[in-house]
Amino acid sequence: DLLDPISLFDGEKETRLSQFWPYVFGKAKSLDSMDVSRYSDLMAKSQFMVARDTIGSIKINKGIKWLDVGGGSGAFASELVKKHPSLKISIFDIPGSNADNQSHNFISGSFFTDQIPTGFDTISCIRVLYDHNDQTVSDLLTKIYSALPLGGKIIISEPMLGELSPNKWGDTYFATYTYAMKTGKTRSPSQVADLLVKNGFSKVKVFPSRRPFVTTVIEAHKN
């Protein structure tokens, strides 16, 4: 897409990136197995650093039940189990995204059309929110809030905008990425926190980022 940046930023052409991510537009039911597989494969290959920084930032209690929304083939879940083998982890994602990994409990569904499964102490969204516009994110957070028990926790982890001043990865690279995707947006930690509070969450905590170009981690609670 950036081979022709003028057309990209003028909005004159259909971008290749938007064609690569049809799931973002709620077209999960129209995706074939190859579409789903290539998406999950790319996410898995780039998930290791995100998983490491996320898991290293937060406190995780033993034996809790954890749901990873949009967890694909289980790259994040696999790293989580390595560090915390007592966790009971499930993945909620569109059909076919776990085709090459049967080691985790997989719950098939789309958060566009289905409710978030219940019975979990913690629900994570790893590189999910920035793929979507504010209304879609708000709807998702409302569903997650409803699915969590009192005292339950949500974990958000993804690249974010600079808070007090722009940064080259969030404000430039990922902002261009979401622009080319034709949906979604990178947000600052305070913008994500505002969305969480507006949808019922409290005790929002933004963790110091180890590598902002990889991810920033936020947790919030249902009380």
Regions found by a protein language model. Give the residues of each.
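Conserved Class I S-adenosyl-L-methionine-dependent methyltransferase catalytic core
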Residues: 1-64
